[in-house]
Design a protein with these regions (language model features):
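Active-site-proximal cap/loop segments of hydrolase catalytic domains
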Residues: 311-517
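Conserved catalytic motifs of the protein kinase core domain
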Residues: 276-278, 357
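Intrinsic disorder/low-complexity segments
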Residues: 516-546
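A fold-wide structural signal in alpha/beta-hydrolase
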Residues: 279, 303-313, 475
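The conserved beta1-alpha1 loop
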Residues: 283-285, 445
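Peripheral, non-catalytic segments that deliver or gate enzyme domains
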Residues: 1-276, 287-305, 332, 345-349, ...
Length: 546
């Protein structure tokens, strides 16, 4: 038995297993070699820098094993022929500050996605297997300021690149023999694409998963030679789902510095734009993670009761490229919160909703977003939900014994540095709680959360109860058996979603509205609480409510 294993890879003959184990803080850091039948395993490499996490995998071509040490801003890869498990691992390119790269293999070349030399949105280069160092890198796809090269899959006769432009993914397919390429684009105004495993190396078919705010998750085979998409399976939505009954939109708000901030929105097709429709507005905005415009059958419960759902694609996420992330981390973090406020003001000004019908939600680092926004502009919102929220930024980032803390200095900064401490203090939700009115708030956490310890939201709620000057409801709900991602059981997770939606619908006066929308959706019913007056950390997925 081997404990705390994070990733594994087998040699070509199946006789040797390479595996990585985690340390006390759940950081993958040691690479071992296990020979079947041997009594002891050999430690090959230990990643001593706590900013870095280690992984191991085998290439799709099956010819090479790769190990990668990666931080939020740097990377260092090594490779080993899969048919030489007792051989020596070879460095590709040593780690450098602000240089991230990924590697794949095809033929006699390594394909490397790199953002070195200041090319923040990445470019694609190739290097000979015999000499993969940076001096031999040859450019295939150049850097483009407004196009993020997100991922690459290499096959025997083609490679497929995931590019993100204006917040949306498209596929770039290149024939290796000729260098000719074409794009695969999709018609909806907002959607999400993810690659399926695609384990076969010699194939013209690329399998992908497509979904949008109104299109259920759908698996397609794309024939790269014939340029045809074949639908293999679409997730069934019970109850006679008709996508034509719903409308999705792509909007843009303008931040205070002139930056255009994307918004994805979905509602019933007959939802009026008169300022009277309730809305759930969600966001994340950290770690360069793009908030997916994905489908949710559970969300129909909100839409069918006249609630519009909107996603704020704010800075700090990855929707608009690497610079979008850079503009919302470290000493730029406040852009994340001011962008969300700008999105809110735009949706109100354009009469998609009004403050008395607006609920906001975020989980983990998205909980930090919601907590910060509530301190800055509580008057804009009627209710808020914070799930496993990272709300005590300074104290958490000062405690290096906690999982993730050291590794996230590159995202938040190290508060032992006075400049970072003062900046964190300017937005930390816990620190900035004050004697002011707040909207109705639900805070949820889990006892077994290893990313955001349960006492962090608990102390936030305790301090908020002491300081807030309103009589609005403040609820604290703790799941005694769940972790950072919520309940693991399917039905437990559905029960949690039902609780959340019931709470949201009650807040906006739609709890008694039937799912067929029998009540008029053009006006808000009297909200349970009057509108107030006045002016995750990653490491475990938190399923978005929206």
């Amino acid at each position: 038995r081997i404990d705390k294993v994070s990733t594994v890879a087998w040699s070509a003959d199946g006789g040797t297993l390479f595996y990585v184990v985690e340390d006390h803080a759940k950081r993958p850091y040691r690479l071992f070699r296990h020979r079947l039948g041997a009594s002891a395993d050999e430690l090959l490499y230990e990643e001593k820098d706590e900013l870095f996490r280690l992984g191991v995998w085998r290439s799709r071509s099956r010819r090479f094993l790769f190990s990668m040490s990666r931080s939020f801003t740097s990377a260092e890869a090594r490779f080993l022929p899969a048919d030489d498990p007792m051989g020596t691992w070879t460095m590709v390119a040593p780690r450098e500050k602000d240089h991230e790269y990924d590697i794949d293999h095809g033929g006699d070349l390594f394909y490397i996605r790199t953002n070195g030399d200041g090319f923040r949105n990445f470019r694609l280069v190739v290097a000979p297997v015999a000499d993969p160092g940076r001096r031999g890198w040859r450019e295939l796809i150049p850097h483009r300021e407004h196009v993020m090269l997100e991922d690459i899959d290499v096959f025997a006769h083609q490679h497929v690149v995931h590019e993100r432009e204006d917040g949306l993914i498209r596929l770039r397919v290149t024939e290796l023999a000729t260098g000719a390429f074409h794009h695969v684009q999709f018609p909806e105004p907002t959607y999400d694409i993810a690659a399926e495993p695609n384990a076969e190396f010699v194939t013209p078919v690329y399998r992908l998963r497509y979904q949008s705010l109104i299109t259920p998750s759908s698996v397609f085979d794309y024939d790269t030679s014939r340029r045809t998409l074949t639908l293999l399976k679409q997730t069934e939505v019970l109850g006679g789902y008709d996508p034509t009954r719903y409308r999705s939109e792509r909007l843009y708000a303008t931040a205070g510095d002139g930056t255009r901030v994307p918004i994805s929105l979905v509602c019933r097709a007959d939802t009026p734009r008169d300022g009277g429709s309730p809305m759930l507005l969600v966001g994340y905005g950290s770690y360069g993670i793009a908030y997916p415009a994905s489908f949710s059958s559970s969300r129909l419960s909100l839409l069918d009761r006249g609630v519009t759902v909107a996603i704020a694609h704010i800075r700090g996420g990855g929707e608009m490229g690497k610079r979008w992330h850079d503009a919302g981390r470290l000493l730029n973090k406040r852009h994340t919160f001011t962008d969300f406020i700008a999105v809110t003001e735009h949706l109100i000004a354009e009469r998609y909703t009004a403050p008395e019908g607006l609920v906001i939600e975020g989980g983990s680092a998205g909980g930090l977003l919601i907590g910060a926004v509530l301190n800055m502009r509580p008057d804009l919102y009627h209710a808020a939900e914070l799930r496993v929220p990272f709300v005590d930024v300074i104290n958490t980032m000062l405690d290096e014994s906690l999982p993730l803390t050291v590794g996230e200095f590159e995202e938040w900064g190290n508060p032992k540095d006075r400049g970072y401490y003062d900046y964190m203090k300017s937005y930390c939700p816990y620190t900035n709680l004050g004697p002011r009115p707040y909207p109705t708030i639900l805070v949820r956490t889990s006892l077994n959360d290893s990313q955001v310890m349960y006492w962090e939201p608990a102390k936030y709620v305790a301090r908020l109860r002491t300081l807030k000057t309103d009589d609005n409801l403040l609820l604290f709900k703790i799941d005694m058996g769940a972790g950072h991602g919520g309940p693991s059981g399917r039905y437990d997770a559905l029960h949690e979603t039902a609780f959340d939606y019931a709470w949201i619908l009650t807040r906006v006066g739609r709890a008694t509205t039937s799912a067929n929308g029998s009540e008029r959706h053009g006006e808000l019913r009297a909200p349970p609480n009057p509108p107030i007056g006045g002016s995750g950390r990653p490491g475990g997925a938190v399923a978005p409510l929206g």
